[in-house]
């Protein structure tokens, strides 16, 4: 059974919250290898910053290092290298990291390049952040601000059954109303930035606050 960690928006300057650090350390401490899947496949400089850090941004590798995870081999895939990328590496790495950014671009990137078959065969620990967490669901909810027309569901990667709304703010009435208006077809979970969902087979652990909106 896959182990999945769904994150909303970790602080790029401070790293993961303590509870999330403990979860990552418990599952991944030691020397590891990682594949990072871009959610902005054409924005190479942005992708490099997300993974390796720059200026005031720690980057994924340093943030994992703060959890006592030493990344020895890093594979960042975007449109620079996807044509030459060896998909069998998905079967060998310890971590598959779905990066934050544009959920629609990431969804299309994974599907168009036939990555999902290999991801589903992999035993790697899966981490999703923001857009990456959104796409892990069977049904991915895309808010209006991502589309500039209206909110909708698209087919996700089917790695879990939790459709999340990242960066959720219960005091943002526009966001709350949008979720309420769109939870008729599928359940939705509003996940604030300091929250997470950890899935280990049939065991599900929620870290900090979350807001469940049931379909009718």
Regions of interest found by a model, annotated:
Residues 1-30, 38-51, 55, 140-216:
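C-terminal and late-domain segments of enzyme folds
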Residues 23, 112-124:
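Catalytic-core regions built around general acid/base machinery
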Residues 103-111:
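Glycine/threonine-rich flexible loop motifs
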Residues 34, 96, 130, 164, ...:
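A residue-level signal for conserved active-site and pocket-lining positions in enzyme catalytic cores
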Residues 44-103:
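A glycine-rich, hydrophobic loop/mini-helix early in the fold
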Residues 31, 92-93, 122-123, 160:
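Short, well-ordered alpha-helix to beta-strand connector turns
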Residues 97-99, 121-139:
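Catalytic nucleophile loop
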